[in-house]
Regions:
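Short, well-structured alpha-helical segments in soluble
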Residues: 162-177
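Structural recognition of the beta-strand scaffold that forms the well-ordered cores
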Residues: 74-78, 120-125, 180-185, 199-201, ...
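Active-site-adjacent mobile loop/cap segments within catalytic or ligand-binding domains
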Residues: 173, 188-191, 200-203, 227-293
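Short coil-to-helix leader/linker segments, especially the first N-terminal amphipathic alpha-helix
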Residues: 23-63, 234-235
Length: 293
């Protein structure tokens, strides 16, 4: 409707009057308030609390991350031999104990422990079928691969293959993780009458490798004192120019888990809870080394 002369209102005409807008101070957005608004509007993604690793087997494939004690750490877990090479062979009655099968089972248990502590873990030697096994006598096979690649029969080629795989992964991992370590797990074979313990070998060229081996040994020594006080621990630490220790780029340790041909050490291997204990202690050794960086 139109207004009258002098912008006056006319009688009998209905007018729509808009509401009065209240004047207030201009809205000022500071960096702090913007950040506050962003933080309250969008939650940060939570730390990964569960992982899936089919290599552990159907029952144990889902891994709950229960701690962040090894967050920021990356590991390369390598079980010895595998594929066409069973490694050392022990015997209990009619059963053959193949080194590669027992080393692999302990390696899987260690890898799972490390994942539970928040670490990134690469399992270098793999068997798509085995998983973590609670059998005393582990069935033997030649299925193992080096992360999917067939394992060569030639020893030097076999060792170089796993070092190449570790080094390729490490070149990328070292940009993301402040602590990268490799472990090579074996089961020593000596004459049947000689009982052995757990032995740790380090690179002669790396001070960090020696520190890691000593911290592993200290961990095992304290565990033996607690769980087997009457037996004592006679394992040692020594430097070795082993092929994998000289050619793997990340700091590494080489572990011999007893004597597969000795009846007492065989118990350490065939009893599943003992294999788990070895894996637990290896993990605690890594934890001690990580804290002492």
């Amino acid at each position: 409707a139109k207004l009258g002369k002098g912008q006056t209102l006319k009688l009998g005409v209905t007018y729509l009057i808009p509401p009065v807008k209240k004047k207030g101070p201009a809205s000022v957005t500071t960096a702090g308030s913007a950040a506050k608004k962003e933080n309250t509007g969008k939650k940060q993604p939570p730390r990964k609390t569960e992982r899936n690793e089919p290599l552990f087997g159907k029952l144990l494939a889902n891994v709950k991350v229960t701690s962040n004690r090894l967050a920021g750490a990356c590991f390369y877990v390598v079980s010895g031999h595998g594929g066409p090479d069973p490694g050392a062979i022990g015997r209990v009655g009619k059963h053959e104990l193949h080194e590669d099968e027992y080393a692999y089972d302990i390696a899987l248990r260690l890898a799972r422990n490390l994942m539970q502590e928040g670490a990134e873990v690469h399992i270098i030697i793999q068997d798509a079928k085995d998983g973590i096994r609670d059998d005393a006598y582990l069935s033997n096979s030649k299925r193992e691969t080096c992360m999917g690649a067939p394992i060569p029969l030639n020893q030097v080629q076999r060792l170089q293959q796993r070092c190449d795989k570790i080094n390729a992964l490490y070149r990328n991992d070292r940009k993301k993780y402040k602590y990268c370590r490799a472990i090579f797990i074996h089961v020593d074979s000596r004459s049947k009458g000689k009982q052995t313990d757990v032995f740790f070998y380090h690179s002669n060229r790396r001070a960090e490798s020696k520190k890691l081996a000593n911290r592993m040994k200290d961990t095992f020594e304290s565990k033996y004192g607690k769980h087997q006080p009457n037996r004592g621990f006679t394992g040692t630490v020594s430097g070795r120019n082993l092929y994998v220790l000289t050619r793997a780029i990340p700091v590494s340790v080489f572990v011999e888990l007893g004597n597969i041909q000795n009846s007492l050490d065989q118990k350490r291997l065939v009893i599943p809870s003992n294999r788990q204990a070895l894996a637990n202690w290896l993990m605690e050794g890594f934890l001690k080394d990580y804290k002492g960086m």
